[in-house]
Amino acid sequence: MTDEALLTQVLMPYKDHCKYLRSAVVTETDGRASARCEFEIPESCYIDDTGHLNSVEVNICYNQMMYYLVAKSVKEGLGTGFESWTLEDFWKHQLPDILIARFSSNFRRPVNPRVFSGEMEFRSVTRRAPAGGSPFVHADTAFRYWDADAGRCDGEATLAFVNVP
């Protein structure tokens, strides 16, 4: 079940017409958290209607899904590498310190942006401390989107959480 108060706070940094994530259910399997989400994009925030989900929207949806998954994992103490974090830590680090180091997406069939589903999972989350550098959390993730008409998109992203508590 979606934590509505948490979702509202996670989406606070977004302009109203860019809040695409409508619901999210977070689960944990074998110590890894994942989220299954529902999205709606009534109108693109930057371009005339293309009739399909595009790469900019895929990235925005990924960000919203990822922020919710991390916040929920922190709040519920899920084993995703954020056990020492508090929600205050998350709010402090949400925008300046959670970086997408690598992002790739594959469009298999056009996805209807008006109503579609998505999911993401943490494949690995590790704390790293490079010699002479500041510690950070490295996370490999996978995601996918689909719609009722067999539209499909999937991809992978690598995250770096810097200035970690």
UniProtKB/Swiss-Prot annotation:
<dbReference type="InterPro" id="IPR022598">
    <property type="entry name" value="FcoT_ThioEstase"/>
</dbReference>
<comment type="similarity">
    <text>Belongs to the FcoT family.</text>
</comment>
<dbReference type="Pfam" id="PF10862">
    <property type="entry name" value="FcoT"/>
</dbReference>
<protein>
    <recommendedName>
        <fullName>(2E)-enoyl-[ACP] glycyltransferase</fullName>
        <ecNumber>4.3.2.11</ecNumber>
    </recommendedName>
</protein>
<keyword id="KW-0443">Lipid metabolism</keyword>
<dbReference type="GO" id="GO:0006631">
    <property type="term" value="P:fatty acid metabolic process"/>
</dbReference>
<dbReference type="InterPro" id="IPR043064">
    <property type="entry name" value="FcoT_ThioEstase_Rv0098-like_sf"/>
</dbReference>
<comment type="function">
    <text>Involved in the biosynthesis of a unique class of isonitrile lipopeptides (INLPs). Catalyzes a Michael addition of glycine to the beta-position of an alpha,beta-unsaturated fatty acyl-[ACP], producing a (3R)-3-[(carboxymethyl)amino]fatty acid. Acts on the (2E)-butenoyl moiety loaded on the acyl-carrier protein ScoB, forming the product (3R)-3-[(carboxymethyl)amino]butanoate released from ScoB.</text>
</comment>
<keyword id="KW-0276">Fatty acid metabolism</keyword>
<dbReference type="GO" id="GO:0016829">
    <property type="term" value="F:lyase activity"/>
</dbReference>
<keyword id="KW-0456">Lyase</keyword>
